[in-house]
């Protein structure tokens, strides 16, 4: 994947409304784990992830600032649901600017928090402060944790692919379970699945 890939994933997950499904936490942990084996450089991983995350949040802020309330009118789809916005909005109203920092460690909310900060016209200087602080805290803590555990359990490097796969599954599982439990998501999937089957059955 490389450092550019790490930065890219951190950027998309933080800055795009459809990036919430990307496994940012597990990516940083796995990158730190690989760094402990000398496969990649820990400092460069942190720099790449930090830049991607901070720039992504800034993009999300500008998106919300320019679109304003239109964000709340976006139609539901398989990869976007208004409930994600509402969940992040409730969290933002409760914690204010600190949401930008706290949300770094909360999948889904992490993606929508900067957008809501833009919609709410948070003072940009305050947003930048929380954004940089949260980005540093997130990237350093997760990559260093992976690095430390990689040093404690060096034999796990022989099974690195299984370790990464396991981390991704654990990271993505809560989101997938939430999707399956959501009635509107299930109805959306059923509707489009039936349309797909009908299209395949229709004569040419």
Which functions belong to the PLM regions below?
Residues 1-8, 33-126, 151-163, 174-204:
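Membrane-interfacial helix-loop-helix
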Residues 19-33, 112-120, 146:
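Re-entrant/interfacial helical elements at transmembrane boundaries that shape
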């Amino acid at each position: 994947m490389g450092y550019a890939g790490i930065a890219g994933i951190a950027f998309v997950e933080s800055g795009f409304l459809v990036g919430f499904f990307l496994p940012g936490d597990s990516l940083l942990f796995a990158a730190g784990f690989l760094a402990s084996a000398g496969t990649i450089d820990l400092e460069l991983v942190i720099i790449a992830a930090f830049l991607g995350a901070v720039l992504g949040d800034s993009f999300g802020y500008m998106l919300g600032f320019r679109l304003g309330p239109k964000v709340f009118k976006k139609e539901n789809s398989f990869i976007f649901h208004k409930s994600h916005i509402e969940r992040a909005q409730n969290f933002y109203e409760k914690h204010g600017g600190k949401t930008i920092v706290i949300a770094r460690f909360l999948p889904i909310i992490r993606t929508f928090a900067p957008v809501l900060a833009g919609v709410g016209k948070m003072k940009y200087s305050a947003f930048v402060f929380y954004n940089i602080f949260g980005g540093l805290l997130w990237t350093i803590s997760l990559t260093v944790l992976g690095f430390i555990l990689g040093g404690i359990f060096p034999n796990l490097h022989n099974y690195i692919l299984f370790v990464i796969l396991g981390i991704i599954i654990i990271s993505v599982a809560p989101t997938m379970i939430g999707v399956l439990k959501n009635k509107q998501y299930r109805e959306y999937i059923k509707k489009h699945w039936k349309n797909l089957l009908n299209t395949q059955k229709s004569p040419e």
